[in-house]
Curated annotation (Swiss-Prot):
This is CXXC motif containing zinc binding protein. It holds the Pfam family CXXC_Zn-b_euk. The lineage of its organism: Eukaryota, Metazoa, Chordata, Craniata, Vertebrata. The gene is Czib. The modification Phosphoserine is found at S75. It comes from Mus musculus. The N-terminal and the C-terminal half of the protein have a very similar 3D-structure, suggesting they arose from duplication. Requires a bound zinc ion for normal folding and solubility. The keyword Nucleotide-binding does not apply. The keyword Lipoprotein does not apply.
Length: 160
């Protein structure tokens, strides 16, 4: 199946460097089995800190699971070197923020939640634990004395 990139698009107001924080950041995804096409009903998360051994000593992945329909063992791995921030200059454009190595599992939907951080453009103030589940976030930058926000968060998956 190969590599699949998650691209984010958002409107940033007075913030930049929107990024996932830490190896325990949870990427909430819905997955499709590459063998039978079954799509998971529930959101599943994968984290950089999780590593599961593949059968037959073929390395490891962030998630290994057996398809409920066809019983095939599939895996997906977060490629840590591909994690990128979404910056002010990326405003309202799709930008790859992470890539996944997919072996039988294909991400088909993404739900941003808590664990993001961003910096004030003028002040450098760090806004931590940003939750994007509602696709919008607002706050106030005391140092710069201006409102800050992230709006209209959307995503797409593209094959690399």
């Amino acid at each position: 199946m190969g590599k699949i990139a998650l691209q984010l698009k958002a409107t940033l107001e007075n913030v930049t460097n929107l990024r996932p924080v830490g190896e325990d950041f949870r990427w909430y995804l819905k997955m499709k089995c590459g063998n039978c096409g079954e799509i998971s009903e529930k959101w599943q998360y994968i984290r950089l800190m999780d590593s599961v051994a593949l059968k037959g000593g073929r390395g490891s992945a962030s998630m290994v699971q057996k398809c409920k329909l066809c019983a095939r063992e599939n895996s997906i791995d977060i490629l840590s070197s591909t994690i990128k921030a979404y910056n002010a200059e990326d405003n309202e454009k799709f930008k790859t923020i992470v890539e996944f190595e997919c072996r039988g599992l294909e991400p088909v939907d993404f739900q941003p939640q808590a664990g993001f951080a961003a910096d004030g453009v003028e002040s450098g103030t760090v806004f931590s634990d940003i939750n994007l589940q509602e696709k919008d976030w607002t706050d106030y930058d005391e140092k710069a004395q201006e409102s800050v926000g992230i709006f209209e968060v959307t995503h797409q998956f593209v094959k690399c």
